[in-house]
């Protein structure tokens, strides 16, 4: 009898805790109106595509356990879809967003409501358009706080400052893309980088709009840094101030201090900053980290960290006190970029798979398509070719008549094939002098199937075809553990012995070292069609992508949900 009472009491307490959890979760309803908006930068006004007339778009703030319903109303002249970058979308690929992968795009005049739940995630993520180059101006922060009463693994500051790094073209980005697609050449590089949508003091007609962040002496703030740029890894620093890194891609890290961070497109990094310097004005700045032998935007964007009540003028008639400028690494400082990345560690012992069921090896890199007429205006790449990119020599082509996920769910043939190779079809010296016969990839819409709950390891190997380069690879629907990396060709006999299987960093986007490799592991516990691609949008457009098809497990709770009734049609 006593044991029954004890059991009943424990059950009652558990039930109360469950209802308290339900009561603490909120449902957020938003409306995203996609519309052209006049935006003036670099002395000129452009009709930029925005959300709710804002550039950058609105910041979404939620807690772990909350749910969202975001209705996207497309009043622009382009097809669009929205991706909630880093949200796992468990069993719900219909809300993931990449056009022609998990949904057909939202056409002009149409509406679609993304419905999803935040499940066991917290930290800094973001959202952006996933339709061609619309994400150049259609993006915003997505901040997930812990459940009420849940602690942080570090002393949490009272104030957050979202820092969205972007790129700006002095013309319509869709026209930049259209020109590159026609000529086969590389797209024109951006004309400016931005911090929260503003280029900063170093660009023409930009000083008045420079973002200023007030801070009190002695105050510690958390900077939530997001690289929303299209095509460029960036170094970021604040003059005379140190950062304490505490999170990357919504996963906590063992804290460490640094003067500079390197952040690739798609990645997020949270840092703590304490105002412990002489009261004044200090530039925060971002400039390119460029590991490729290719043109890039070699400008610098700035904002100002301004101590409250600090003097801003030298005296009557003597002008303003110029902000202190940070020392940034050189644009090609791979040593600094690598040293930063190598210091990242998961904040505690990580639940990384110790054994693997799927051992995959993917080459990632550029390529060239030969032209029958090298003098054609459509063949203005190197030596009369067209640029391409591939994984395992397969250059991904988006379908047009249906999305991969819809075709997979409905069993519709002819949209994709499941013969993406698990290893390169031809093995070669990946980082050496590669024969020109291996520079031309094969085009196709190819996917690779994974069994539910299989332990997956992928080695991503950069190649020297065209140029070695840091490729920020993003996997939809998953977080993964970065268990190892190195330069040169991956050695399957010796390199795994150096893997970190204790506290590897957890990410959703990771760069391949230029001329090197990176190894990741994850458990395939989220059924559906999940895009894996380079987050440099030029490379994605050239085909540096593939799709994983993760099969259903057993029963409803291990299977993909039914598609929503308002899912857009092609």
From Swiss-Prot:
Binding-site positions, Cu cation 2: 85, 128, 535
Gene Ontology process terms (BP): lignin catabolic process
GO cellular component: apoplast; Casparian strip
Sequence ranges assigned to domain Plastocyanin-like in this UniProt record: 33-149, 159-310, 419-554
Record's signal peptide: 1-25
Named cofactor requirement(s): Cu cation
Keyword annotations from UniProtKB, A to Z: Apoplast, Copper, Glycoprotein, Lignin degradation, Metal-binding, Oxidoreductase, Repeat, Secreted, Signal
Pfam families: Cu-oxidase (PF00394), Cu-oxidase_2 (PF07731), Cu-oxidase_3 (PF07732)
Positions that bind Cu cation 1: 83, 474
EC number(s) stated in the UniProt entry for this protein: 1.10.3.2
Family note: Belongs to the multicopper oxidase family.
Name of this chain's protein: Laccase-3
Organism whose genome encodes this protein: Arabidopsis thaliana (Mouse-ear cress)
């Amino acid at each position: 009898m006593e044991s029954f009472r004890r059991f009943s009491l424990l059950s009652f307490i558990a039930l109360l805790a469950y209802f308290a959890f339900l009561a603490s979760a909120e449902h957020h309803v938003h409306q995203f109106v996609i519309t052209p908006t006049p935006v003036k930068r670099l002395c000129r006004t452009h009709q930029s595509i925005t959300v709710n007339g804002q550039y950058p778009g609105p910041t979404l703030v939620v807690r772990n356990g909350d749910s969202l319903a975001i209705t996207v109303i497309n009043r622009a002249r382009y097809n669009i879809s929205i991706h909630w970058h880093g949200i796992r979308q468990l069993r719900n690929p219909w809300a993931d967003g990449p056009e022609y992968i998990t949904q057909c795009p939202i056409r002009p005049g149409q509406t679609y409501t993304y419905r999803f739940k935040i499940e066991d995630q917290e930290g800094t993520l973001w959202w952006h358009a996933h339709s061609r180059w619309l994400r150049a101006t259609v993006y915003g922060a997505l901040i997930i706080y812990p459940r009420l009463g849940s602690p942080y693994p570090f002393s949490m500051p009272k104030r957050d400052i979202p820092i969205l790094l972007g790129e700006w073209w002095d013309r319509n980005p869709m026209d930049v893309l259209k020109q590159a697609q026609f000529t086969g050449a590389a797209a024109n590089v951006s004309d400016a980088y931005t911090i929260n949508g503003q280029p900063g003091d170093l660009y023409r007609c930009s000083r008045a709009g420079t973002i200023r962040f007030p801070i009190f002496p002695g105050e510690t703030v958390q900077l939530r840094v997001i690289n929303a740029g299209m095509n460029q890894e960036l170094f970021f620093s604040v003059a005379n101030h140190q950062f304490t890194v505490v999170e990357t891609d919504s996963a906590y890290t063992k804290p460490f201090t640094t003067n500079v961070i390197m952040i690739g497109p798609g990645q997020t990094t949270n840092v703590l900053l304490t105002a412990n310097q002489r009261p004044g004005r200090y530039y925060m700045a971002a400039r390119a980290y460029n590991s490729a032998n290719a043109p890039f935007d070699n400008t610098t964007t700035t904002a100002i960290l301004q101590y409250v009540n600090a003097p801003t003028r030298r005296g009557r008639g003597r002008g303003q006190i110029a902000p202190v400028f940070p020392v940034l690494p050189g644009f090609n400082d791979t040593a600094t970029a690598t040293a930063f990345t190598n210091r990242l560690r998961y904040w505690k012992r990580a639940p990384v798979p110790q054994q693997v069921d799927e051992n995959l090896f993917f080459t990632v890199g550029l390529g060239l398509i030969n032209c029958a007429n090298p003098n054609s205006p459509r063949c203005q790449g190197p030596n009369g070719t067209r640029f391409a990119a591939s994984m395992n020599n397969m250059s991904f082509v988006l379908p047009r008549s249906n999305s991969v996920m819809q075709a997979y769910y409905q069993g519709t043939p002819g949209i994709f094939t499941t013969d993406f190779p698990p290893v390169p079809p031809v093995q070669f010296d990946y980082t050496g002098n590669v024969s020109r016969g291996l520079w031309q990839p094969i085009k196709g819409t190819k996917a690779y199937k994974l069994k539910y709950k299989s332990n997956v390891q992928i080695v991503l190997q950069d190649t020297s075809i065209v140029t070695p380069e840091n490729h920020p690879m993003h996997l939809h629907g998953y977080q993964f553990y970065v268990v190892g990396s190195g330069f040169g060709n991956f050695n399957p006999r010796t390199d795994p012995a150096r893997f970190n299987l204790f506290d590897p960093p957890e990410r959703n986007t990771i760069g391949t070292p230029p001329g090197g490799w990176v190894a990741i592991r994850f458990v395939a516990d989220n059924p559906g069609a999940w895009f894996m691609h380079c987050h440099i949008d030029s490379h994605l457009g050239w085909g540096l992508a593939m799709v994983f098809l993760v099969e259903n497990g057993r029963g409803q709770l291990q299977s993909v949900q039914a598609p929503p009734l308002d899912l857009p049609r092609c």
